[in-house]
Every structure is written in structure tokens, then in C-alpha cells.
């Protein structure tokens, strides 16, 4: 169903494009040998190149180029064998050279595509316009001193991939799905860790509104939004603001805006620059970047199985629904965990335990699968205990809760607590006789035609045996006894 804003003059459509700045996983910066570790002491990872000392020349880091090419291949994008680095000129205190090295007209990666998995089970393609390499700026710290701004250049020179989407998204939910899918692909590839809270993946949000079928409206760009939730909120607020502005007789100005999460609103930051404002020109210190097709082919051979392919395989090989397969492949570690659990077992039962029980429990405590106290082999062991009749499904829930708390193996918990399923027909006979004796009136009702009471008797017997009785045996013996 289309996402439309109901204005006073009719329905308005949102047009969304996203520019994602993804920090490249690399031990060194794009043009210097300085380290890139997060959380280092201020200005402790800065080379003379990063600080723009006179006479210092940039030398390209091949690993960063390889990571960009790998990402382009993961996005099914065109890899340009010749690309050019340009100087993007602007002044800011945390940009010591007075320019950023970026790629303007000839990026390393061209058109690509991402397939979104939406909440209603449908999919949608979003085009990738380009991916280019550039260096990050430093960081200005305004909250360290009442009257001074401090500058930390640790981030200056760190390699970024700017991944620019086409304006193909039409709702905040699609934008969120795009960011989640892009982050998943980057993590599968190992080219960016996607940690938005650390700033290694940041998003600029381009929003415009129009009446359905009309030309694109004037867009605004909301800079450096650092969580998927904030991206959704910024889109909702900005689209509503533009509709109200236009319907009130105003005009949307092409400008750069800032998202204020405390107030839940965007606010004007500066007028939006055009490309000519930056006076782009090829960097005279860097030759055009030329790569060989054979090198690209070698990188392609090293690509892992990507989320879309893995999802299709899970559906085909394991018989999983698109929804369950989508949840399992959303994180590479999660998919690997599931495959270990499912090996040699009922794949749908394994999916139920991983998604319904384990992920549900981890989500409540804000943990992901890599922090699970239950190992994949141990969860598989719990499933084995249920399928071979050692414990009942009811007891399995108690064992699972204990595993979650202690990390102990399921077999040890079962033995220690005496939870083995009761298959002794004599013991089950006795429990049934006691339940029937205590509920003689209900036995009479059952025998007079109230067969729905059968479930009541099963529940009473299971309670009497503390859930340990074999359900199939209980059903069989109980049915015989109740018939008299």
C-alpha cells in the first residue's frame, strides 16, 4: 500500500534518496599509514599527510580500493576500471588541507541495485547511482570547553565509501529497510562494520514531496543522521514540514538541514551547495586510478554467499518461509548459527527454536546472536532430546530457560534435575487413576458425551507428573480408561 501524506489540498508522495558514508574496514587510512582504530586518544592516529603538512604526498592504500570494488560487486554494480580522485574544496577547522580528496565525475563504482525485503513480505528494488571513495574529515568537539572548540584529527584521512542511492524510496519504512539491507551486505562482505553508534556508517537523507504523478519537488538534505530510527523520524518530520509549507503558500528551499533528536525535528543548517561551489578539480598529486579486469575477477571469486542468495537457498533447501529465511540471513552470524543447529535435524523445528525461542529471548535483553549464552551445538542437543523422546516439549522450555541462564549443556541439566520423560506405563497408569478418582464428576460428564473434557484430563495428568509424562502414552492410556 502506498505511503501518502494527507494534506489540505490532497495526497502527497514522498521521494527519498539516501547517501550513506560507510567507513572502510582497513588497518590504515586511504592515503596514509596512520591507524584507524575506534576510541583512540585524540590526535594519536594522525600522520603528516592527514595533518596536511607542506610537501606531504598521498599514497593510495590498495586494501581500501579492494574493499570498494568488493562492495560494488556485492551491490551488483558496474566496476569502473578507470576512476579519478578530485579535490573538493571547502574550509572547516577539522579539514586541515582546505579540501577533501573525493571522486566526482569518475567514481570507482557505477550503477547497482539493492533488493529490499519489506515487512508485508513484498520486495522492492532500489537503484544505486554510484559508490565513490573519499577521505573523512576530522572531528570538531564543541562540548569540551565553554568558549573553545577542540579538534581531533584521528578520523581525518580515514577511507569512506559514499554509497548514493537513486531517489527510488517512497516511505520511511522503505528507507529503513534499505539501510538495514545495505548494512547487512556490508557486514557479509567485511567491508564496513555498520556500527552507526560509532559513526562508521552515517546517512544523509534527501527528501522532497510532490503530488502523485507530478515532477520531483525541491529536495532538502538532512546531514549525518546516525540511527535507522532517526532516519525514519527525520523523513516523517521533513516531509510533513514541506507539505505544510507548500500548502501554506511557501516554497521549499534547497538547503542542508540538521536532525535534532531531542526535539524530534529538522532545522536549517545552511543553504545547499551545488557542485560548482566546491570547485572540484582532479587532484594533481594523484594519478587516475586504473585497475585490471583480472584483478576485479579475482576479488569476485572471494565473495561470500550474500544475503539474497542465502535466503533463496534456505527457502529451497530447508523449506523455510520467506519471512523466517529473511530473519535468519539478516546477520551472517545468525545464519551460520542456524545452519549448525539445523544440521542433521528437522530444519523447520530448528528455525522455530532459533527464531521463536533464542532470538526472542536475546532481543529482550538487547543482545545479538554473537552474545548468546547458548552455543549452536547445545541448542541442537536440546532439539535432539525432544525428538528422541528423552524429554517432552513442555520440559524443553524449562531446560531452555536454564541454558539461557547458565550456559550449561541440556543433557547435564536434564540429568541433574531428573527431567527425563516418564515412559513407564505403570507410573502413567497410576497418575491417570488418581486424576480420574479426584474428578469423578467430570469422568461422568465425559462418558455422557462431553468429549471436550479430554484436554482437561491430559492437562491434569501432565501436572501430576510435573510435565514429565510422555504425551503420546498419556493420550493413549487416558483414552482407553475414560471410555471405561
Swiss-Prot record:
The EC category is ligase
Give its E.C. classification number.
Answer: 6.3.5.-
- For whether the record's keyword set contains ATP-binding, the answer is yes
Q: Name one GO molecular function term.
A: glutaminyl-tRNA synthase (glutamine-hydrolyzing) activity
Record's Pfam families? GatB_N, GatB_Yqey
Q: Which UniProt keywords apply?
A: ATP-binding, Ligase, Nucleotide-binding, Protein biosynthesis
What domain of life? Bacteria
Annotated InterPro entries: Asn/Gln-tRNA_amidoTrfase_suB/E, Asn/Gln-tRNA_Trfase_suB/E_cat, Asn/Gln_amidotransferase, Asn/Gln_tRNA_amidoTrase-B-like, GatB, GatB_C_1, GatB_Yqey_C_2, Gln-tRNA_amidoTrfase_suB_CS
Quote the catalytic activity from the record.
L-glutamyl-tRNA(Gln) + L-glutamine + ATP + H2O = L-glutaminyl-tRNA(Gln) + L-glutamate + ADP + phosphate + H(+); L-aspartyl-tRNA(Asn) + L-glutamine + ATP + H2O = L-asparaginyl-tRNA(Asn) + L-glutamate + ADP + phosphate + 2 H(+)
Q: Which NCBIfam families match?
A: gatB, PRK05477.1-2, PRK05477.1-4, PRK05477.1-5
Protein name, UniProt field: Aspartyl/glutamyl-tRNA(Asn/Gln) amidotransferase subunit B
Q: What is the lineage of its organism?
A: Bacteria, Pseudomonadati, Pseudomonadota, Alphaproteobacteria, Rhodospirillales
Query: Gene encoding it?
Result: gatB
Amino acid at each position: 500500500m502506498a505511503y501518502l501524506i494527507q494534506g489540505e489540498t490532497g495526497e502527497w508522495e514522498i521521494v527519498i534518496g539516501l547517501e550513506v558514508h560507510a567507513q572502510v574496514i582497513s588497518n590504515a587510512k586511504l592515503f596514509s599509514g596512520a591507524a584507524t582504530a575506534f576510541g583512540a586518544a585524540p590526535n594519536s592516529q594522525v600522520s603528516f599527510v592527514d595533518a596536511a603538512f607542506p610537501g606531504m604526498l598521498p599514497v593510495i592504500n590498495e586494501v581500501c580500493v579492494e574493499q570498494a570494488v568488493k562492495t560494488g560487486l556485492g551491490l551488483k554494480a558496474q566496476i569502473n576500471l578507470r576512476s579519478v580522485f578530485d579535490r573538493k574544496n571547502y574550509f572547516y577547522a577539522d579539514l586541515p588541507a582546505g579540501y577533501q580528496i573525493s571522486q566526482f565525475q569518475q567514481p570507482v563504482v557505477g550503477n547497482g541495485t539493492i533488493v529490499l525485503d519489506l515487512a508485508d513480505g513484498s520486495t522492492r528494488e532500489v537503484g544505486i547511482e554510484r559508490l565513490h571513495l573519499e577521505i573523512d574529515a576530522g572531528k570538531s568537539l564543541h562540548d569540551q570547553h565553554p568558549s573553545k572548540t577542540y579538534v581531533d584529527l584521528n578520523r581525518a584521512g580515514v577511507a569512506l565509501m559514499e554509497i548514493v542511492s537513486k531517489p527510488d524510496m517512497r516511505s520511511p519504512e522503505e528507507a529503513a529497510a534499505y539501510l538495514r539491507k545495505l548494512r547487512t551486505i556490508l557486514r557479509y562482505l567485511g567491508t564496513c562494520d555498520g556500527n552507526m553508534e560509532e559513526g562508521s556508517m552515517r546517512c544523509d537523507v534527501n527528501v522532497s514531496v510532490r503530488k502523485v504523478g507530478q515532477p520531483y519537488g525541491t529536495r532538502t538534505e538532512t546531514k549525518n543522521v546516525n540511527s535507522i530510527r532517526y532516519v525514519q523520524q527525520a523523513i516523517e518530520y521533513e516531509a510533513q514540514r514541506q507539505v505544510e509549507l507548500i500548502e501554506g503558500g511557501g516554497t521549499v528551499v534547497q538547503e542542508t538541514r540538521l536532525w535534532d533528536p531531542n526535539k524530534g525535528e529538522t532545522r536549517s543548517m545552511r543553504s545547499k551547495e551545488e557542485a560548482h561551489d566546491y570547485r572540484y578539480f582532479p587532484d594533481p598529486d594523484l594519478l587516475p586510478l586504473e585497475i585490471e579486469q583480472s584483478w576485479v575477477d579475482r576479488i569476485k571469486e572471494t565473495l561470500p554467499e550474500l544475503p539474497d542468495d542465502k535466503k533463496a537457498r534456505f527457502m529451497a533447501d530447508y523449506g523455510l518461509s520467506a519471512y523466517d529465511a529473511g530473519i535468519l540471513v539478516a546477520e551472517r552470524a545468525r545464519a551460520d548459527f542456524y545452519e549448525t543447529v539445523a544440521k542433521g535435524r528437522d530444519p523447520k523445528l530448528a528455525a522455530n527454536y532459533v527464531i521463536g525461542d533464542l532470538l526472542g529471548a536475546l532481543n529482550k535483553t538487547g543482545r545479538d546472536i554473537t552474545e548468546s549464552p547458548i552455543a549452536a551445538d547445545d541448542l541442537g542437543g536440546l532439539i535432539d532430546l525432544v525428538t528422541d523422546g528423552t524429554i517432552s516439549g513442555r520440559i524443553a522450555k524449562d531446560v531452555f530457560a536454564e541454558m539461557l541462564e547458565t550456559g550449561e549443556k541440556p543433557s547435564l541439566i536434564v540429568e541433574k534435575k531428573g527431567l527425563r520423560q516418564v515412559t513407564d506405563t505403570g507410573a502413567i497408569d497410576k497418575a491417570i487413576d488418581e486424576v480420574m478418582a479426584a474428578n469423578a464428576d467430570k469422568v461422568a460428564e465425559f462418558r455422557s458425551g462431553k468429549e471436550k473434557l479430554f484436554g482437561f484430563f491430559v492437562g491434569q495428568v501432565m501436572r501430576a507428573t510435573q510435565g514429565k509424562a510422555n504425551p503420546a502414552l498419556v493420550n493413549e492410556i487416558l483414552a482407553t480408561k475414560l471410555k471405561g
